[in-house]
């Protein structure tokens, strides 16, 4: 009985070591204009070069012309309504007097990049994901995704230590 217990403890310890070896990393990329800022935050498995999640944060500065500010809010709300029921996607909104924003969190375990029904329902989301999430070898590759968005002038933000 003691041998079984000792063996179980050793095997359990080995399992925890293997689980701890997963090399999860995070990278942030920003594209900024005079009126907007888009931030992509990737969480990825460094060893497998596989994206685990993508968070897209969009902030748009509002015009002082009320009609333009209202039109911007309406466009954002249309996008949110398209996206809100897609599996693996969580969305949050922010609203202020000078800027509005929204954050889209994509869980790659649940999100279906090649689902025709979801693509038809939320074409704007999938157009963005086709830029930010690049498949390579039957998985969403971080290195291929990074290369693609850097060509579009997204700048990687280095962590300050």
Language-model regions, residue ranges each:
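Bacterial N-terminal signal peptides that target proteins for export
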Residues: 1-9
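Subset-of-secretome marker
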Residues: 23-161
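Alpha-helical transmembrane segments
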Residues: 11-15
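C-terminal motif of bacterial Sec signal peptides marking the signal peptidase cleavage site
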Residues: 17-20
